[in-house]
Regions:
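A ligand-binding cleft/hinge motif common to bilobed small-molecule-binding domains
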Residues: 85-100, 183-208
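A conserved helix-loop-strand patch within extracytoplasmic ligand-binding domains
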Residues: 102-149
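A bilobed periplasmic-binding-protein/Venus flytrap-type ligand-binding module shared by bacterial periplasmic
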Residues: 115-125, 221-234
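Short helix-initiation/N-cap motifs at beta->coil->alpha
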Residues: 40-41, 63-75, 169-180
Length: 285
């Protein structure tokens, strides 16, 4: 019995020491602030998973800030944000990057094959943006958008001019746009919205992009991780992980759907990281 007590005491002491070292390690590391685009499902999922890895695997304290796209870029440039994983280039955020490229670093690619444009349900009998005026009445002359000032909204304004559309672009938010889309889908009514991939709505409904013969919205894009130049010095280990972090349609889709189904972003991210240790290990090597 005495031997058992001694062994138990040693085990408890070792566990306490390990916990103390872990706490000390976290205390010695700087707090990191990541920004993400408020209302963008992919941005929410990607940033929360990255934050979970930084916290649970690398021992950093992480603060998350939901912001608009323009503020995200400005925040990284000023150092208010250490990094953001939602830099869509070359089209969507091209204007922001052109203005701030001397003050930020693109440190990694976290998603390839991204795309923006105008989206309709598959039951809608319109194929091209150029054909929208012919169906103005069906759409009530309206394009349902997201946040005013977002890159996709700027491109949509350009598309309205380029195609001489007699349509109004209605600003709302990412969640409000999907609510309007859900309502239209339920009633099988025509609707055209600003949209992008990756997004959980493509897993939920049969949707397609309208053809864009003038290429106003550009070709497929890449989502980059953008960081303040000081991150490498401030937190080299974190910078290394963020450079390596990249995931697939299936991976990001699983987290986005979990959130859409009612899970909190933090819990969805935590569960995904716990269920995919080998993938996480790849990012940390």
């Amino acid at each position: 019995m005495r031997t058992v007590k001694i062994l138990f005491g040693k085990s408890l002491a070792a566990a306490t020491l390990a916990l103390g070292l872990s706490s000390a390690m976290a205390a010695d590391k700087p707090t990191l602030t990541l920004g993400y685009v408020n209302g963008w499902a992919d941005s929410v999922a990607t940033t929360h998973v990255a934050a979970e890895v930084l916290q649970s695997q690398l021992g950093y304290n992480v603060k998350l800030k939901p912001v608009e796209a323009a503020i995200m870029w400005q925040g990284v440039a000023r150092g208010d944000l250490d990094a953001a994983l939602s830099a869509w280039l070359p089209a969507t955020h091209g204007d922001y990057y052109d203005k701030l490229k001397d003050k930020v670093n693109l440190i990694g690619t976290n998603y390839t094959g991204a795309k923006i444009g105008l989206i309709v349900p598959d039951y809608v009998d319109v194929q091209s943006i150029a054909d929208l005026n012919q169906h103005k009445k069906a759409f009530q002359g309206q394009i349902t958008g997201i946040d005013a000032g977002a890159g996709i909204m700027i491109r949509t304004e350009e598309a309205i001019k380029a195609y001489d559309l007699d349509f109004n672009l209605m600003a709302s938010s990412g969640p409000a746009m999907t609510i309007a889309l859900a309502r239209a889908e339920k009633q099988q009514k025509p609707i055209v919205v600003t949209g992008w991939i990756p997004h959980w709505m493509f897993a939920k409904w049969d949707l397609r992009f309208l053809e864009d013969p003038q290429q106003v919205f550009g070709e497929a894009e890449t989502v980059y991780t953008v960081a303040n130049p000081g991150l490498e010095t401030k937190a080299a280990e974190a910078a290394g992980f963020l450079k390596n972090f990249a995931w697939t349609d299936k991976e990001i889709g699983a987290v986005m759907l979990a959130i859409d189904n009612g899970e909190t972003p933090k819990k969805a991210a935590s569960a995904w990281v716990a269920e995919n240790p080998e993938r996480v290990a790849e990012w940390l090597n």
